[in-house]
Amino acid sequence: MQRRKGATWERELAAHLRSEGIQAQRGIGQARRSSEVPDVDVAGWWIEAKRHQRTNPKAALQQAIADAAENGEGRIPVAVCRDNGQPLQAATVTLRLGDWIQLVRDRRIVDTVAKGFV
């Protein structure tokens, strides 16, 4: 049952990301490959999707970090966690501080260029 619930959450998350204009699909390679694949495949990201009674974002992020280091080809590890009974919008996203800082810097560069300050 846990595996089925996890697969359902991965499909739901991928569908939601697609509805937001992000190219995403469920990573189904665990059964087909010898190497690990992200739960949800989005270019540049290693997404570990967890859904439990009480999720553990820190443990999920540690799994994403380990898997991305071994198989991620430079992808940023991130954990997307949702507790049972909560709506999708209540899901949390956890990533390392350094990765978040880089995202803020990258966004600042994009905003600066868009405003014509460069």
What are these regions (language model features)?
Residues 1-118:
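Catalytic phosphate/metal-binding cores of nucleic-acid and nucleotide-processing enzymes, i.e., regions
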